[in-house]
């Protein structure tokens, strides 16, 4: 029996994958979605199947697929509208799961026109944007809570911190990690909502805390998110400049280049088109929380708190919806409402700073100040204008035979040697300059061995009297640690040579009253009482 070559088997398998109609979308991939109805999950499954079919047959209307995805995102936002105050957080998590599925199923296709569609090109950028948006909102929550006088319960703070740690870990690793561990991330989001519900039922959560969480997690602007994609369908060129690497050649992301580094978050750069992130004029937002009950009753998609109208007919005259005031999952009725009721509706917009241009120079602001920010300006164009690529360095004509310039300090340079410690530092401050060349002190104190060491037993002796006394026995310098230490200090600090140490055996010398402390070369008092009197 003749064996089939292995290369032929692999080639046949690749051809089967290349010409197959679509990749089977498993229904188990819809399990990570949070608080969505079964009907909504079935619509998402049909959308994924249609998206895979569009990757194989790109002749299909590309704008129709994009409109279906936008409609699905708006329907997800409508289903999460009643989950007050975590509507913004849960919307980000569910949109992250949806766009991660679009990105992952795009990578599974082996057909040639996979990356030619708009959704496949933008999928990874949307996933990255939502992930860094989660990092931005959670960081802002932990920073503004203590400055605003908000005390987060310990279980809720730990749950939010676990979500922040997971998101930051995904941002600092390889770009492939964005499409992994969807279930882990959605489980952390579900843990936050369940923890908040348990604390709210116990009466621990106040209305101020609930309003603060609602302001900390604004809803994402879905129309502005899809605006560059629709412009790309109409023929506009996509520009995705790399902000992290400002070199002439864009490096490929790998662990050695982008490991343990965090790039500039996209929410800081895309604020011009993404209006859900309104800059607070101060870190203390306690003024916004004067009437927290009114903030909780506001629509989470209200433009005053960074939202957007879900329906197009509500753009001109937004109507107040009463469905959000009675949430079905998270109830804030048991919250403490003993707070001053001051109306903050007229001053709500004034507490936010005006339009902010992050990371822009004065020249860029001056050049773009007269240009109206209309809806025709695409997001990549704004990013490319505000963050131009680094100018390439001009090549220099250097002769390869020319020796290279040596690095470091050249020989014979006039650099001063670091001064060493001189004996003048041990002299008194009132000694004249002419006396600083003294080689050794005139008097040294000695203490008898059979008496206590106090100020009355200190016996000074001169160098001349020590040599004239016949009863003095010299000590071997090689056998004492003091002489060894004195020699080391002399070498290190360029000190004068110490005098010969001698011991007194059964000799009682009278105290010389003529000895002055300045003769010893010391500037500090000799006894504790003198030290106290000096102080």
UniProtKB/Swiss-Prot annotation:
Residues 384-426 are annotated as: Disordered. Residues 404-419 have a biased composition (Basic residues). GO terms for biological process: regulation of DNA-templated transcription. The keyword Transcription regulation applies. GO terms for molecular function: DNA binding. The keyword Transcription regulation applies. It comes from the Viruses. Keywords: Activator, DNA-binding, Early protein, Transcription, Transcription regulation. Pfam families: Herpes_TAF50. Transcription activation. Regulates the delayed-early 110 kDa promoter. Belongs to the herpesviridae TAF50 family. This is Putative transcription activator BRLF1 homolog. It comes from Saimiriine herpesvirus 2 (strain 11).
């Amino acid at each position: 029996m003749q064996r089939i070559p292995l290369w032929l088997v692999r080639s046949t398998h690749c051809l089967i994958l290349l010409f197959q109609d679509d990749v089977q979308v498993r229904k188990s991939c819809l399990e990570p979605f949070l608080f969505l109805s079964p009907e909504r999950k079935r619509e998402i499954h049909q959308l994924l199947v249609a998206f895979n079919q569009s990757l194989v047959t790109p002749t299909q209307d590309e704008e129709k697929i994009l409109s279906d995805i936008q409609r699905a995102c708006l329907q997800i936002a409508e289903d999460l509208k009643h989950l007050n105050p975590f509507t913004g957080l849960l919307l980000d998590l569910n949109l992250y799961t949806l766009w991660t599925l679009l990105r992952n199923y795009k990578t599974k296709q082996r057909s040639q026109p996979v990356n030619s569609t708009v959704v496949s090109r933008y999928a990874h950028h949307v996933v990255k944007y939502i992930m860094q948006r989660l990092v931005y909102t959670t960081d802002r929550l932990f920073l503004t809570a203590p400055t605003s006088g908000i005390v987060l319960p310990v279980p809720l703070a730990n749950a939010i911190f676990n979500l922040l740690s997971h998101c930051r870990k995904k941002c600092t690793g390889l770009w492939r990690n964005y499409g992994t561990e969807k279930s882990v991330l959605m489980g952390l989001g579900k843990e936050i909502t369940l923890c908040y519900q348990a604390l709210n039922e116990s009466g621990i959560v106040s209305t101020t805390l609930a309003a603060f969480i609602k302001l900390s997690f604004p809803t994402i602007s879905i129309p502005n998110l899809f605006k560059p994609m629709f412009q790309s369908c109409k023929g506009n060129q996509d520009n995705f400049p790399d902000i992290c690497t400002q070199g002439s050649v864009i490096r490929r992301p790998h662990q050695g280049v982008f490991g343990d580094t965090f790039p500039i978050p996209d929410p800081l750069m895309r604020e011009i088109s993404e209006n859900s992130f309104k800059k607070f004029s101060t870190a203390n937002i306690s003024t916004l929380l004067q009437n927290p009950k009114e903030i909780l009753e506001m629509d989470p998609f209200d433009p005053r708190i960074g939202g957007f109208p879900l329906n197009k007919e509500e753009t001109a005259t937004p109507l107040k919806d009463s469905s959000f005031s009675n949430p079905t999952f998270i109830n804030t009725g048991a919250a403490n409402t003993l707070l001053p009721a001051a109306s903050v509706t007229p001053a709500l917009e004034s507490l936010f700073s005006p339009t902010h241009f992050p990371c822009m120079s004065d020249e860029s602001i001056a050049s773009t100040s007269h240009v109206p920010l209309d809806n025709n300006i695409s997001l990549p164009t704004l990013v490319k204008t505000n963050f131009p690529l680094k100018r390439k360095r001009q090549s220099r004509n250097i002769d390869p035979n020319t020796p290279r310039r040596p690095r470091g300090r050249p020989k014979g340079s006039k650099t001063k040697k670091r001064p060493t410690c001189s004996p003048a530092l041990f002299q008194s401050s009132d000694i004249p300059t002419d006396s600083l060349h003294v080689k050794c002190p005139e008097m040294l104190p000695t203490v008898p061995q059979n008496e206590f060491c106090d100020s009355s037993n200190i016996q000074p002796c001169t160098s001349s009297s020590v040599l004239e006394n016949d009863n003095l026995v010299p000590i071997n310098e090689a056998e004492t640690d003091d002489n060894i230490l004195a020699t080391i200090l002399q070498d290190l600090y360029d000190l004068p040579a110490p005098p010969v140490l001698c011991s007194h055996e059964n000799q009682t010398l009278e105290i010389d009253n003529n000895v002055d402390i300045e003769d010893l070369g010391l500037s500090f008092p000799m006894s504790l009482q003198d030290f106290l009197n000096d102080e």
